From Swiss-Prot:
CDD domains: NAD_bind_m-THF_DH_Cyclohyd. One of its GO terms (cellular component) is cytosol. The lineage of its organism: Bacteria, Bacillati, Bacillota, Bacilli, Lactobacillales. It comes from Limosilactobacillus fermentum (strain NBRC 3956 / LMG 18251) (Lactobacillus fermentum). Homodimer. PANTHER family: C-1-TETRAHYDROFOLATE SYNTHASE, CYTOPLASMIC (PTHR48099:SF5), C-1-TETRAHYDROFOLATE SYNTHASE, CYTOPLASMIC-RELATED (PTHR48099). Pfam families: THF_DHG_CYH, THF_DHG_CYH_C. This is Bifunctional protein FolD. GO terms for molecular function: methenyltetrahydrofolate cyclohydrolase activity; methylenetetrahydrofolate dehydrogenase (NADP+) activity.
Amino acid sequence: MVELIDGKQLAKQLNEETATRVAALKKRGITPGIAVILVGDDPASAIYTRNKHRKAEKLGMKSVLKTFPADASQEEVMACVQELNNDPSIHAILVQSPLPKHFDEKALDNAIIPEKDVDGFHPYNVGRLYNDDPDKRYPVSCTPRGVLKMLDHYNVDLDGKDVVVMGRSILVGKPMQSLLQNRNATVTMLSAHTKDEEFYMRHADILIVAIGHPQFVKAQDVKEGAVVIDVGINRLEDGSLCGDVDFENVKEKASLITPVPGGVGPMTIASLMAQTVDLAEWSEE
């Protein structure tokens, strides 16, 4: 019998914990602050940014939104990043993706100082994750962090398990691989260049999918009893949302699966808020 991962409920619990931590910091005179930089007028980005802004304020944090037109220059946005780097009231900075094509996104991400790099994209923080830095005081990309918290909540043992990660983005795939390997999982990462990807998928104890292809993973691709984590979110022609997994059919074979919507998405934002508080706490130590 398949069990559905309730991302909304887990996110609610995590947000409650975060609100408690924010209140404790405020008693010490510290208000966690997050700044989001939005460039252009992409509708989805505007919605995501607004959701993050509202959630931070609801949890009692300082939330700053910096907006720029699509024709803004790299230098203008870079200057904003440097200003926020030097602002002691801001503990977390992120640049909302995607950016207009004339931007060097990696350069912007690298300009955020490691101590405020809430997305975990700075090479210094990537290196600490890759090396499994024992003090754990470094930010990790928020979606993989949320996925790991889900797996832990549902007591999914990672030690020695065959885990397949589909998609190798810096946002999900690559940090997910490192987090899992740090927990002694045997990880295979698939990309568009992988030959016979169905072979790897069918042998996975845990399948994590983040490729942006609607309902790409079918029931015949999944091992009986596998844990399936669907990171994708896609809008179909009829306006409905779906993931990268054919949920209705795959759930008949999986032992544990995330729905879309209501699975990974809520945990990503909740993890972003929790990590902002982490950065605020670490800044005072």
